[in-house]
């Protein structure tokens, strides 16, 4: 299979367990190909865990899930050293993050210290325990979920932490027809029976192919102009950082690959910008008072920044 056929096969296989959420699956796979992590804002019970299991099966990845609660410790994520009487030395006991695909369920129920431990692993790709450094397996993907802020026992993730996630999306309720189909059979069981379409090494090759997608200089300038517009907007108190621009570039390349192209276009930028950038924007007090949202302000900016004409 060529690259486009492989990507389509992954989506088709994953879609057997996740009904009616093709757009969500495409966004998640795009972020995975871009080498990023995923943050999902939604209520419990809309299929987030099923999505995670489905992707780990189709991508051939090891998988661990942790239900975050206030009593979860950083060492539960990173691991710890244990004294081994037989050898007379300390040995490392791996934490939950030592895997390919880590589902951090309800991350905003954990303490800030525990959240920071996970975000450090996400950023560095390695973790430190008692002065020793351990590298997480590659590929390494974190899918974190959080309940809407204000739900019992939750605390909002600060901007410095949400900025570490390449995309922030919602799943939403299923349609009436799809919910009926869900009632007819267990989607979770269907996810467990999915076949592996590719191997972890294949995924690394797909990531390399995404990174090699050609981007014209004028398109890089377009991305920077979008970021600059967020920094200059009176509706925004904190605009897109260079990290956000880099995420936009990676997502643009990955989206082009998803579409079967070896080159990126302005349409790729516009397709991924809403869910790659909106969580990196902090609105001004006046904008919030006026009822504006990060999504609506970003949409206005995307419409105002001139698109380049590629040669």
Task: Give short role names for the model-derived ranges.
Residues 1-24, 212-214:
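Dynamic helix-loop-helix/coil hinge segments at AAA+ ATPase domain boundaries and subdomain interfaces
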Residues 27-30, 83-103:
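Conserved alpha-helical scaffold flanking the Walker A/P-loop in AAA+ ATPase domains
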Residues 32-69:
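Walker A/P-loop
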Residues 42, 105-106, 117:
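Walker B catalytic acidic pair
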Residues 43, 77, 145:
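P-loop (Walker A) phosphate-binding loop of NTP-binding proteins
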Residues 58-86:
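AAA+/P-loop NTPase substrate/partner-engagement loops
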Residues 84-89, 110, 114, 122-213, ...:
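Canonical AAA+ ATPase core
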Residues 232-311:
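C-terminal engagement/docking regions of AAA+ P-loop ATPases
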